[in-house]
Amino acid sequence: MLPTRHRMTKSSEFRQTVKRGVRTTHADLVIHLRRGCPDSACEQVEGPKVGLIVGKSVGGAVVRHRVSRRLRHAAAELLPKLEPVDRMVIRALPSSSTALSASLRQQLRDGIDRSARRQEPAAERQR
């Protein structure tokens, strides 16, 4: 499971990550990843934080909670790939309710890799 200290809880963190992070779109997920942190928050870094957005379009309460559990578990496995100052928001699309856990995990892994590559400076990308 995703440890509490790695869960995004403040609406301001969600807003900043979605607004300023790099978005990658997949079949069942939309991932917003923000590398680094605003100057005021750098002192209190406790590790990467992950937030979930699972709307009613995904399904009823039982389905939404099942999708949330799958995404939290997949995110917990991928925490070592993130820097301590990273913030990630995962938005579940309606098709995520029927997706396999392995598929969600792979989409999440691909999203992190693509977002990280897009945020690298151009000089480092060409190496």
UniProtKB/Swiss-Prot annotation:
Catalytic activity annotation: Endonucleolytic cleavage of RNA, removing 5'-extranucleotides from tRNA precursor
MF terms (GO), sorted A to Z: 3'-tRNA processing endoribonuclease activity; ribonuclease P activity; tRNA binding
GO CC term, one of those recorded: ribonuclease P complex
BP-aspect Gene Ontology terms: tRNA 5'-leader removal
UniProt key word RNA-binding: yes
Enzyme Commission number(s) of this protein: 3.1.26.5
Keywords assigned: Endonuclease, Hydrolase, Nuclease, RNA-binding, tRNA processing
Disordered: annotated segments: 99-127
Biased amino acid composition, Basic and acidic residues: 107-127
A Pfam match: Ribonuclease_P
Subunit description: Consists of a catalytic RNA component (M1 or rnpB) and a protein subunit.
HAMAP family in the record: RNase_P
NCBIfam families linked: rnpA
Family of the protein in this entry: Belongs to the RnpA family.
Task performed by this protein: RNaseP catalyzes the removal of the 5'-leader sequence from pre-tRNA to produce the mature 5'-terminus. It can also cleave other RNA substrates such as 4.5S RNA. The protein component plays an auxiliary but essential role in vivo by binding to the 5'-leader sequence and broadening the substrate specificity of the ribozyme.
Name of the protein this chain belongs to: Ribonuclease P protein component
